[in-house]
Amino acid sequence: MEPDSKKVKLDIFNFPTTRETRTPEEVAESYAEAVKSHPFYDNVHSVVDFYDSGTIKDGRGQIIGVVLREALPKYAASMASELLTSAAVRTSLRSMMFGGEPPLSGIAGYFDYRGSPVELKSRKTSFTYEHEAAWPAVFPVVDYVSEIYRHVAPERWKAQNDAIPDLVRIHGTPFSTLTINSRFRTASHTDVGDFDAGYSCIACLDGQFKGLALSFDDFGINVLLQPRDVMIFDSHHFHSNTEVELSFSGEDWKRLTCVFYYRAALGEPASYAEYQRRLEKSKTDTRFTPVVHHVRVKENGTSVNRPSPVYPISQSPFWVPMVAHCLQHCASAAQCVHEAMTADGSRLAEMMFGESLSTSDGIPLRGEDEKVKANGDSTPRPLSRLGGFSETNLMVSTAVEKKKYLDSEFLLHCISAQLLDMWKQARARWLELVGKEWAHMLALNPERKDFLWKNQSEMNSAFFDLCEVGKQVMLGLLGKEVALPKEEQAFWIMYAVHLSAACAEELHMPEVAMSLRKLNVKLKDFNFGGTRYFKDMPPEEKKRRMERKQRIEEARRHGMPSGSHEKRANWLTNDSFDYQTEDCVIDYAQHKWVLPALHAKEVTKTVRTGELPTTERVVRVLVVIPDPQSKLENVDCKLEVPDMVGSSSEWERLMSSPAVHRVLSAAQRNLQLPDSVTHGNVQTHFAFHSTLPTDIYDFVVLQHVLSRIPDDAQASAYIRRAAALCSGCLFVVETDVQCRQYYTLKYSIRCSYDTVAPLFFQQLHRVCYGTKTARVRTKGELESLIPTVCCARYKLQGSPLNTTVHVVSPFPSCEVQNLSSALCDRA
């Protein structure tokens, strides 16, 4: 009995109308798989949060990165941000760096498309092609970043500038490509494909956010980037972003960054061959006049795409002045203290900060079940039309019931005989090639269960050819030229289930071998660049499809407000020699904009990249400790807390640390003033906080003094008073009442922690310093007290008091710049 074709067509596309997202179990599985290869690093995993401009080097003196604050003019950042915001779109291509979820990311400029299903390689990105008229808006920011790069690392800049093909430069700079990220917390990765002999540059173009520091994972260093900040760095070191610091669930935030780099594959022989092919083709096209008339081949060096070697850094709070540009006046003196503090067996840190730099048995870290997902801001979204299909259990189970509709006996009554014949032939050809490859795999390993999909194989080409026919089958079933998103979803999942079942039933492959996930990935490839296989089709089919494509495009144009979709279709098949057609001259004088070279000279004038000079003079450090309000002996913390607090799981967790119990059983630290101590050429002096001396020291350390001053205005005034006693910088040592993982915690756990933490740390301060009611502050509260420039925050690892050290310049920012400039002039 013949099936009713109308009912069949209706039933084929009658899929569940529930939101097309994955189940929680599927999301969790995807997340776990992603973080195996690309883990997230939270703030707790680092030692230093670096806030100011500085030059960061590894243990052998090689530059990791140079960061410059507010180095971009406002107009340049604003112009680029306005254009590039739309370049960051949901993409599954970088989902492994976002816990298995598609982040907001995109590329602009030129790209090689090596390993991509896009056939036409080494050319403009679709974004630049589609926004060619507006593209010059990025030229100022690209010019400024390039000049900053040239001033900071001239040898690297020159190597990159000499290697990059002129055809793919962005506005004459050594950058070929931009990567734009929006609200994207990246997991640990290196930038594979960047030019080995150069550096990459990153700029924050826009945003309102806290946290999301650029973390150099192997060094424990976080660099806080805010709008208009620029960093030149070795992108072959593993790097990531720390958590966003949200005060409450649903807090609004935004962050737009741009990475500037040279994609090394654009200078390889295959790319030059593509450039030359396009150039020769353009000579026969009288309708198009190229901007560039020859291809100059350049030496590209060797890019091995391996992570840079890691030479660890010995860190202490005194490492910060060795790095910060605004503290270079005291860098050599700080180096003396740093070396003495990090020497084997040194107890200098305990003398200055009240505890060692690292404690192995401090307050325990949280379990993953207490934390929000690192990509938790990525709310579930419908799949993109450029994707494959939803893999939810409901969608899959429905598709299993409907896969029969792609059998020939059903299609016979629903589509043309010609299209059915094409379907049968393409399907048979693909299954034949899959069978051959599977037989070869079994010959090598009879126990094999998984099918290895080779992207460059004949089987892969046959799959895309089958997809082209399948797309026409879908349109034939619908009886229209354009499918709705939900119709595409329904068809492609049914298509994948049908093919997976065919592999199992006809080729006797294990069900897991040709999995739905594997087919979904390849369908995403097809929907992004399936036109690459058009050239392999028979001439009569090419003609029929071209006519059909023309009708579809015409229908799209009539129904859309802009030509963006037409542009995209044109980009996929664009084979012209259109390099540098987007370029133009920027008249900086007419706009009254500062020239990039002059601007770079100004913003980099305090940059120090050479070796630090040594000093033999005596370095004097003043350590200020709280006055002993009273002598407290044998304090039992449990007697000091209400029963409800003392019995809470949070209190028990904090009290579980052996280091905490050592603090509780130790003698009070400030019962008497210690004598001055000399370590080499480092002299350490001590004073109570109420009787500051009048002498000037190289460095002043305030050891838990502010916890004795509850009034914020008075505490800020005290910092200013102490800063006046040092010629180098000030170290503010205080308890951070928020735990190091605070912004990664679930909000219910945060609330439980907030209830007990102040009382817990007050107990420790009573024992350590005799402070009856310590004023313990959050990181934000502490930093708001600083009246000058806070250069960095150093975190004593495993500290039972959760101690942090803020490194503070004694001078306001304008005085810092003048002092640094004077030092550079003398140098």
Curated annotation (Swiss-Prot):
Cofactor dependence: Fe(2+)
Reaction it catalyzes: thymine + 2-oxoglutarate + O2 = 5-hydroxymethyluracil + succinate + CO2
An example Gene Ontology biological process: base J metabolic process
EC number: 1.14.11.6
InterPro entries: 2OGFeDO_JBP1/TET_oxygenase_dom, DB_JBP1, DB_JBP1_sf
Record: residues binding 2-oxoglutarate: R255
Name by which UniProt lists this protein: Thymine dioxygenase JBP1
Gene that this polypeptide is encoded by: JBP1
